[in-house]
Amino acid sequence: STPLYSSAASDVYKRQNQNRKLFKKKSRSNYKLGCIITIVILIPVLYGVYLYCQQFNTQTQKSNEPQVNTSSQIPSGRNLEIPVSLAPKQEQIIRHTGYTVSYNKDLKLPNWVSYELTRQETKGKEKRSNRFIADPLAIGTIATNADYTRSGYDKGHMAPAADMKWSPKAMKESFYFSNMCPQHPQLNRRGWKNLEEKIRDWAIADSAVIVICGPIIERESKTIGKNKVAVPQQFFKVVLSPFVKPMRAIGFLFNNEQATDPLHSYVVTIDSIERLTHMDFFATLPDEIEN
């Protein structure tokens, strides 16, 4: 009976050994499968943790940086060029290549003219055209050369031709009558011209300036010519250097008469010009700059 028992035991041992091998094989397969599943699950989790850390580091860096009050940041360009009217007036806003004009068809004058002059633009070589023509975009009656003939007044540029040398089109448009006002010859050729030259110097020094200028008209104004072009009593000009720190702004006021005094004689606060014109210039500027 002993051999029979030994044979049976041997068979059992073999089966157990095979089962153990099969179990180990399955265990290894299950282990590999589990590892793969774990890796697949961990990849997006780890990536999410990475993104969170990056975001946290960025926020930490920003919190350690000097804080800038964005509400005090001053917009540039045409946002600053357009004054805010504080009283109703007849106007048509016309945007030309080199300047923007608020044209008043009743007065046959601009209410105001504004433009930005950059350092690069002062280097222009375009020649002066001297051809005064009607603004094709202006609606209503507009002045003509005949209105100024023997009137005793110059056709005074608001946006100067010398500031438009950077473009043939800008130069041509600077001679539109919508950009002209009747000016005393010794204002146009002296004080007003001297200020235009000084502003070009500022544009070069400060990289750019924004200029707004125009006439000041009383209710009962003298007129010239068949088209009854109003003759201003005064002229204003406000200038802003928006890219210097601190920003600078200055105002000038001229009577429409001979102007031969030094330029500083005509300096006034921008606030005082705003009261005269019923307009708000550089509306986003702090009051201390305008004063």
Q: What are the language-model segments listed below?
A:
Residues 1-13:
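Single conserved hydrophobic/aromatic residue that forms the stacking wall/gate
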Residues 14-291:
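Domain-level detector for secreted/extracellular nuclease and nuclease-toxin modules, and
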